[in-house]
């Protein structure tokens, strides 16, 4: 019975992986190459570790499930972008435009959100803010708070 359950679980996992849209290879290459204005790009599931999109326009981009560990994202426009399940640990989102962005399930350990307005972000939780850090200029939705970066 256990073997049957494992086979069923593997089949469901394979189906889910097949259904998930893969990142656009050309868009990922643009990010890695430093050509970073990428409005509406499909970067879902991409490895974007240690890349930099500082002060560029990526509004409406799909970062769902991407690994953006240590990514330099400060001052960039991510309005309307999706970061569902994205690894943002160590990323620098200082002063980024996240108006209407979706951070549902994003991991934000030691993520800098200094000076960032998060009041219109979707899916933001206190647990995410507890793992991140900001400053006096960081704006969070009512009832939430963020620690100051040291």
Which residues make up each language-model segment?
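Sec-dependent signal peptide recognition
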Residues: 1-7
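N-terminal signal peptide c-region/cleavage motif recognized by signal peptidases
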Residues: 13-17
């Amino acid at each position: 019975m256990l073997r049957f359950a494992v086979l069923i679980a593997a089949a469901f996992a394979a189906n889910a992986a097949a259904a998930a849209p893969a990142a656009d290879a050309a868009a990922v290459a643009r990010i890695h190459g430093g050509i970073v204005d990428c409005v509406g790009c499909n970067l879902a599931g991409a490895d974007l570790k240690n890349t930099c999109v500082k002060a560029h326009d990526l509004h409406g981009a799909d970062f769902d499930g991407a690994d953006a560990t240590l990514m330099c994202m400060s001052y960039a426009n991510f309005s309307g972008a999706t970061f569902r399940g994205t690894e943002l640990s160590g990323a620098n989102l200082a002063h980024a435009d996240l108006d209407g962005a979706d951070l549902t399930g994003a991991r934000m350990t030691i993520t800098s959100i200094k000076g960032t307005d998060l009041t219109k972000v979707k899916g933001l939780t206190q647990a995410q803010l507890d793992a991140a850090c900001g400053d006096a200029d960081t704006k969070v939705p009512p009832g939430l708070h963020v620690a100051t970066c040291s």
